Amino acid sequence: MKTKIILILFLSIGLIGHGQVMTLEECIRQGIANNLTLENSRIDINKSRTGISQNRARLLPVINGVFQFTDYLKRPVNVTTGTLLGNDFPEDPTWQTIRSMQYNVNAGVQLNMPLYNQVIYASIDAAKTVEQLSHLSYEKAVEDLTMQIGKVYYLAQSSLEQTMLTDENISRMQELCAITEAMYEQGVVLEVDLNRARINLQNLKAQQDQFAMLYAQQLNMLRFLLDLAPEEQLEVERMPRDIVQINISGISHTLPELRMATKQKELIDRKITAIKAEYIPTISLTGYAGALGYQDKINHFFHTKASSQNWFGNCFIGLNITIPIFDAGSKKLQIRQHKYDAEQAINRAELLQDKIMTDYSNALLQLDHNIEVFQTQTQSYQQACDVFKVTQEQYREGVSSMTAILQDEMQLRTAQSARTQAHYLFNLAQLELLRLSGNLLSLTEK
C-alpha cells in the first residue's frame, strides 16, 4: 500500500513537472479574474447600487388600481331628520331612516407621491455610503486574495526547492553508498558502516516523498485560489538563487481597512441622521379617481338598465401632512445605540492603526533577520559543501570514518534547509511590507 501511494505521488509530480509554469504575477492576475470570493464581492457592489436605486424610487409617485366588491349581509342604515330629505317627506318627522343597498362596487385609481420627506433623502445618503463600503470591501478582498496566493506560491516554491535539493542529497548519498559498498567488499569498512549509509539513503527518500506530497497539496490549494480545474497542470517557478529586495515605502494611510473603518463610522452617522429626520413632518400628495356603484341585486350590475344608472363618480386630490408627536422615546433610544456604535467604530479604527504600525515594525525586523540568516546560511552551505568534499575524499582513502562523513552530510543538509526556510520567510515578510505600504498590486505590474 505504501509503495502505491509513493508511486502515485511521483506520477503527480511528474505530470506537474510537465505542466504550465506560472509566475506569481500570472497567478495573481488569474486569481483576481476567476476567484469566486471576488465574484461575490462584485455582486455585493451591484446589490448596493440597487439599494440606491431602491431608495430613490421612493421619491416617485405610486399608482395603484383599486377594486372592491362588498356584499352587506345585513344592510347598513343611515338615520337623519326628515327636514334634510326634502319636500317628499312629512314636514315634521321625528327621525327618518335610510337603508343602503346590499351590493356595493368601488373601482378607481389611487395616487400617492411624497413631496417632502427628509427620511428618504437621508436613506439615499446612507445607501451611497453602503455602496462605497462595498467597493472598499472588494479592494480588501482583492488584497486578501493576493496575500493568500502569494503565501501559497512562496510555500510551493519552498517545497519545490526542498524537493530538488533532496534529489541532490539522494544522488550524493547513493554515490556514498556505492563507495562504501565497494570498500566493504574489499574489507576496508565494516557492515555497520554500509548499513548506516543505506539507512540515511532511505531516510532521504522518505523525506523526498514528504516534500513531493506537500508540493502537490500546495499546488492543489493554488488551483483552488485560481479557480482552476483539479486536473489542470500547473507548476510554480523555482525559487531564485538569491533574495530579491524591493524598495518599500512607509505605511500607507489609504489602506482598504483604514478607509473601511472611516466609512463605517460615516455610515453610523448617516443612520443617526436618518433617525433624526423622522422627527420632521412629511408632506405627500394623494389623489383618487374612480366610481361607486350600488344595486339591490347583483345581476343588476350587468343585465338591467339600472346597471348604468346607479354609478357615481368619485375624484379628489389632496395633501397628507404627518407630524410626529410621541413615539415613547423609540427614536431617542435608537440614536443612543448608534452613538455607542460610533464610539466603538472610533476605537476599532485606532486599534487598527496601532496594529498596522506594529505589523509593519515586526515585518521590517523579520525582513532584516531573514536577510542575515539567508546570507549566513548561504556561506555555511558553501563551506559545508567544501568540507563534505574533503571528508568524502578522505573517506575514500580510508582516513575519515563513516560517522564523520555522515555528520558533514547532515550539516550540509541543515544549511540547505535553513537557507531555503530563510528565503521563504524573507518573501513572506516582504509580501507583508508591500501590503502595509499599499504597493501589493505592484506584483501584477511586473
Residue ranges of each PLM-predicted region?
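Small/polar-residue-enriched beta-strand and adjacent coil segments characteristic
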Residues: V62-L73, T81-K140, T262-K271, E278-L351
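Outer-membrane beta-barrel domain signature
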Residues: T70, K74-V77, T81-T83, R196, ...
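Amphipathic alpha-helical coiled-coil segments
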Residues: N40-N55, A141, M147-M164, A182, ...
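Short, charged, amphipathic alpha-helical segments
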Residues: K128, E191-N200, R336, M402-M410
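Bacterial Sec-pathway N-terminal export signals of envelope proteins
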Residues: G19-Q68, K74-R75, P230, E235-K271, ...
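Sec-dependent N-terminal signal peptides
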Residues: K4-G14
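Periplasmic alpha-helical coiled-coil/stalk elements that build and connect Gram-negative outer-membrane
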Residues: T50, V142-T254, Q366, N370
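Acidic, low-complexity, intrinsically disordered peripheral segments
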Residues: N64, L73, A418-K446
